């Protein structure tokens, strides 16, 4: 589950790169995606907690104003699952209401994931795990939930950590 989303629509590639750089430097957010809407018009999507998304959008808007034009910006706290699907891209074969089949936590997935989580003190969200391994979000969520139910992980909010 994504904690919060920040969307920033700008005119110009230079403004978009400048805004993305400023957003990532200003707050603890992750660039989830970007969309080129028209030639020269781009939308940047960041993920993080709500305060971080707001700070990132403030910094990104200021940077984009210096080199281009800001069309619009929006923060979305605790987005609905269908909204997450919409932001994640339309290329998924499943519809947002369908559940992906459970993917068992195979030993090689589990070992690699546990090693990664051991190196990240604050834990990781399913979205961060999916981005790191190049997995679909549902697969990452299923593997994390399987390890959580097996007692290997603890969960606080949307973050998974190694159980001490």
Swiss-Prot record:
GO BP term, example: ethanolamine catabolic process
Record's description of how this protein is used: Artificial BMCs can be made in E.coli by expressing eutK, eutL, eutM, eutN, eutS (eutSMNLK) or eutS alone. Cargo proteins can be targeted to them and beta-galactosidase (lacZ) was active within the BMC, showing the BMC allows passage of substrate into the interior. This can lead to the development of tailored BMCs for specific metabolic reactions. The addition of eutQ to the eutSMNLK construct results in biogenesis of multiple BMCs.
Designated name of the protein: Bacterial microcompartment shell protein EutK
Entry function: A component of the bacterial microcompartment (BMC) shell dedicated to ethanolamine degradation. Expression of eutK, eutL, eutM, eutN, eutS (eutSMNLK) in E.coli leads to formation of a single BMC. Coexpression of eutQ with eutSMNLK permits E.coli to make cells with more than one mobile BMC, as is usual in vivo. The ethanolamine (EA) catabolic bacterial microcompartment (BMC) probably concentrates low levels of ethanolamine catabolic enzymes, concentrates volatile reaction intermediates, keeps the level of toxic acetaldehyde low, generates enough acetyl-CoA to support cell growth, and maintains a pool of free coenzyme A (CoA) and NAD. Deletion of BMC genes (eutK, eutL, eutM) restores growth of eutD deletions, suggesting there are dedicated pools of coenzyme A (CoA) and NAD in the BMC.
Induction profile: Part of the 17-gene eut operon transcribed from a single promoter, induced by ethanolamine and adenosylcobalamin (AdoCbl, vitamin B12).
Subcellular location: Bacterial microcompartment
Domain named EutK-Ctail: residues: 108-164
Annotated family: Belongs to the bacterial microcompartments protein family.
Biological source species: Salmonella typhimurium (strain LT2 / SGSC1412 / ATCC 700720)
NCBIfam families reported for this sequence: PRK15466.1
Additional note from the record: The need for a bacterial microcompartment in EA metabolism can be bypassed by increasing the levels of EAL and an acetaldehyde dehydrogenase (not necessarily EutE).
Keywords: Bacterial microcompartment, Virulence
Chief subcellular location: other
Annotated CDD domains: BMC_CcmK_like
Gene knockout outcome: Not required for aerobic growth on ethanolamine (EA) supplemented with cobalamin (vitamin B12). A double eutL-eutK strain grows as well as wild-type on EA and cyanocobalamin, but a quadruple eutL-eutK eutM-eutN strain does not grow. A non-polar deletion mutant grows on EA at pH 5.5 to pH 7.0 but not at pH 8.0 or pH 8.5, releases increased amounts of acetaldehyde on EA plus vitamin B12. Preventing acetaldehyde vapor loss allow growth up to pH 8.5.
């Amino acid at each position: 589950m994504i904690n919060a989303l920040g969307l920033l629509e700008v005119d110009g590639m230079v403004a978009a790169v400048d805004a993305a750089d400023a957003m990532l430097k200003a707050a603890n957010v992750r660039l989830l995606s970007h969309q080129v809407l028209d030639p020269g018009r781009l939308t940047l999507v960041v993920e993080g907690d709500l305060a971080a998304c707001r700070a990132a959008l403030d910094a990104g808007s200021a940077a984009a104003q210096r080199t281009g034009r800001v069309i619009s910006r929006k923060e979305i706290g605790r987005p609905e699952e269908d909204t997450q699907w919409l932001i994640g891209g339309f290329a998924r074969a499943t519809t947002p209401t369908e559940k992906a089949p459970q993917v068992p936590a195979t030993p090689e997935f589990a070992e690699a994931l546990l090693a990664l989580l051991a190196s990240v003190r604050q834990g990781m969200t399913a979205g961060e795990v999916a981005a790191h391994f190049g997995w679909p979000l549902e697969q990452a969520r299923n593997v994390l939930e399987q390890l959580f139910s097996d007692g290997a992980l603890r969960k606080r909010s949307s973050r998974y950590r190694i159980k001490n």
